[in-house]
Swiss-Prot record:
<comment type="pathway">
    <text>Amino-acid biosynthesis; D-alanine biosynthesis; D-alanine from L-alanine: step 1/1.</text>
</comment>
<protein>
    <recommendedName>
        <fullName>Alanine racemase</fullName>
        <ecNumber>5.1.1.1</ecNumber>
    </recommendedName>
</protein>
<dbReference type="Pfam" id="PF01168">
    <property type="entry name" value="Ala_racemase_N"/>
</dbReference>
<dbReference type="InterPro" id="IPR001608">
    <property type="entry name" value="Ala_racemase_N"/>
</dbReference>
<dbReference type="GO" id="GO:0030632">
    <property type="term" value="P:D-alanine biosynthetic process"/>
</dbReference>
<comment type="similarity">
    <text>Belongs to the alanine racemase family.</text>
</comment>
<keyword id="KW-0663">Pyridoxal phosphate</keyword>
<comment type="function">
    <text>Catalyzes the interconversion of L-alanine and D-alanine. May also act on other amino acids.</text>
</comment>
<dbReference type="InterPro" id="IPR009006">
    <property type="entry name" value="Ala_racemase/Decarboxylase_C"/>
</dbReference>
<dbReference type="InterPro" id="IPR011079">
    <property type="entry name" value="Ala_racemase_C"/>
</dbReference>
<keyword id="KW-0413">Isomerase</keyword>
<feature type="binding site">
    <location>
        <position position="319"/>
    </location>
    <ligand>
        <name>substrate</name>
    </ligand>
</feature>
<feature type="active site" description="Proton acceptor; specific for D-alanine">
    <location>
        <position position="37"/>
    </location>
</feature>
<dbReference type="GO" id="GO:0008784">
    <property type="term" value="F:alanine racemase activity"/>
</dbReference>
<dbReference type="Pfam" id="PF00842">
    <property type="entry name" value="Ala_racemase_C"/>
</dbReference>
<dbReference type="GO" id="GO:0005829">
    <property type="term" value="C:cytosol"/>
</dbReference>
<dbReference type="InterPro" id="IPR000821">
    <property type="entry name" value="Ala_racemase"/>
</dbReference>
């Protein structure tokens, strides 16, 4: 039984379909790291990980220690890589829970190694190489090769992987992404020439998987990191229009009408006098607000689906509640409202909501609060 009259509905068959789409694109012998950071982009990390592991994922990718620990408590035998920065103070917890960390400096590698040796253990690490994102990583040059040699010599570390991150593989013109891969491949060859090899070599995110697997840029890769595509979204609208791979919607934001009010003409609805009733207005109140992830800016800007009818969201979205106008809408208290989700029910999908807010669906779904229950169908 739901504890609130609002929830996130997750289509598990679509999750499986989208993972199968990844498998159909990457090389047959490739390993797949399902990226489940940010609560699996709002879907729910535990259930999503369970499904991806059932479908053949070899690795899980997250951004923070807390995310990794949550997954480790459920999937203790599954390798988990923290793709984001891990402070030195996290070293003991990384080691004790057999987690893998991203590193990009000799100084941090030395701290991690010393901590591991005190526990008579080894910490698995993946080296981050900056090929053009200019966020984190070692430069792909001779100096970094010497640093990598020193890192590999540390007794408390097991350097199991090396990777880079593509910043613009969803662009129509792939020049930058291909230049990144050219730099990464050249660096891998330089390392190999000095007998420096890695169990895992990875670079492709969803955009790379969807657009760059037909060339030879991925010839040295054996691990792939799908993220947003697992949840039914293309990395950009341009890719959605041109990509032959079919992805299925996974996530819908839903709420029930908890009260219907008749408000006379000449009144304001909600905070700040942002909606004026120029006629007698039937107002449905939903127990859903911006603290749940429904952006405040959507008030007076979108229509929501109620019993296959479209009704406007009116007034400013409150922290915990919002309003819909029900004039000429067949609805009653307790009826379900789809704020965004499956278009077969006439609702906007999250990418359309994102476009309206001049953002991306990654933000629309990953900001859905954990206080919303996830209902898996």
């Amino acid at each position: 039984m739901l504890k609130r009259a609002s929830f996130v509905e997750v289509n598990t068959a679509s999750l499986r379909h989208n993972f199968s789409a990844v498998k159909s694109i990457v090389p047959k012998d490739a390993h797949i790291m399902a990226v489940v950071k940010a609560n699996a982009y709002g879907v729910g990390a535990i259930k999503a990980s369970e499904i991806f592991l059932q479908e053949g994922a070899h690795y899980l990718g997250v951004a923070t220690l807390d995310e990794a620990l949550e997954l480790h408590s459920h999937f203790s035998k599954t390798p988990i890589l923290i793709l984001g920065y891990s402070p030195n103070s996290n070293a003991s917890m990384l080691i004790d829970n057999d987690l893998s960390a991203m590193i990009f400096s000799l100084e941090q590698a030395e701290v991690f190694s010393q901590t591991a040796l005190k526990s008579q253990k080894r910490l698995k690490v993946h080296l981050k190489i900056d090929t053009g994102m200019h966020r984190l990583g070692l430069e792909p040059n001779f100096k970094s090769i010497e640093i990598i040699k020193k890192i590999r010599a540390l007794k408390g570390l097991e350097v199991e992987g090396i990777f880079t991150h593509l910043s613009n593989a969803d662009a129509k013109i792939k020049t930058h992404a291909k230049n990144q891969m050219k730099a990464f491949n050249a660096f891998l060859e330089q390392l190999s020439n000095q007998k420096i090899e890695f169990q895992y070599r990875h670079a492709y995110n969803s955009a790379g998987i969807l657009s760059l697997c037909n060339g030879n840029e991925n010839r040295f890769l054996n691990l792939y990191r799908p993220g947003i595509m697992l949840y039914g979204f293309y990395p950009s609208n341009g890719m959605k229009e041109t990509c032959p791979t079919i992805l299925k919607n996974v996530i819908s934001l839903k709420a029930q009408i908890v009260q219907i009010r008749s408000v006379k003409k000449g009144e304001f609805i909600g905070y700040g006098e942002h909606f004026y009733t120029n006629e007698e207005t039937l107002v449905g109140v939903l127990a859903l607000g911006y603290a749940d992830g429904l952006m405040r800016a959507l008030g007076n800007r979108i229509q929501v689906a109620i019993n296959n009818q479209l009704a406007p969201l009116i007034g400013k979205v409150c922290m915990d509640q919002c309003f819909v106008k029900l004039n000429n809408i067949q609805a009653k208290e307790g009826d379900e409202v789809i704020l965004f989700g499956d278009k077969s029910a006439k609702a906007n999908d999250a990418s359309e909501i994102a476009a309206l807010l001049n953002t991306i669906p990654y933000e629309t779904i990953s900001t859905l609060s954990k206080r919303l229950e996830r209902v898996y169908i």
